[in-house]
Regions:
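A hydrophobic alpha-helix adjacent to the NAD(P)-binding/active-site core of NAD(P)-dependent oxidoreductases
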Residues: 48, 89-90, 104, 112
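Conserved Rossmann-fold NAD(P)-dependent oxidoreductase catalytic core, especially the SDR/UDP-sugar
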Residues: 98-133
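NAD(P)H-binding glycine-rich loop region in Rossmannoid oxidoreductase-like domains
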Residues: 53-92, 123
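Conserved cofactor-binding/catalytic machinery of classical short-chain dehydrogenase/reductase
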Residues: 55, 70, 96-99, 111
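N-terminal Rossmann NAD(P)H-binding glycine-rich loop of SDR-like oxidoreductase domains
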Residues: 5-25
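Conserved glycine-rich Rossmann-like NAD(P)H-binding loop of the short-chain dehydrogenase/reductase
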Residues: 27-38
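Rossmann-fold cofactor-recognition segment
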Residues: 43-55
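SDR active-site strand-loop-helix element
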Residues: 8, 32, 71-75, 112-118
Length: 133
């Protein structure tokens, strides 16, 4: 499996689950998330980097320091806040994601996993959504 995984959005709902599963498989986990996202729900075994996806120097330092061999990119603005501030959402959700991918390519870090959102499929979804949809 992987030696070290960087999980962006690692303190969020999906990020915590992914990080726990990676940890259970013996992978060292580095969670990158916003300040204020840490708390009792966070696994103390994981390294935590608190910062903003738009802070490229912090992302570069995180990659250089922790040397992940896989990146699971889950950090993003949610739909409500994205609709309220579309320019910021574009910078966080799109531009920062592209920059992170470029940093990984420059350092030969891979694989790179990106998870989108069920909101991609529209507002009237049954829950849960079938994988075949």
């Amino acid at each position: 499996m992987f030696k070290t995984a960087l999980v962006t959005g690692g303190n969020g709902n999906l990020g915590r689950l992914v990080a726990q599963n990676l940890e259970a498989m013996g992978t060292r986990v580095v969670s990158f998330d916003l300040p204020g996202s840490e708390g009792p729900h966070c696994d103390p075994r994981h390294a935590v980097v608190l910062g903003d996806m738009r802070d490229q120097s912090l992302l570069e330092d995180t990659l250089a320091t922790h040397k992940p061999d896989v990146v699971i990119h889950l950090a993003s603005m949610l739909s409500g806040s994205s609709e309220a501030n579309p320019e910021l959402a574009w910078d966080v959700n799109a531009s920062s994601s592209i920059r992170l991918m470029r940093h990984c390519l420059d350092r030969n870090i891979g694989p790179f996993f990106f998870a989108s959102t069920a909101a991609t499929y529209g507002p009237d979804l049954a829950s849960p959504v079938a994988l075949t949809r």
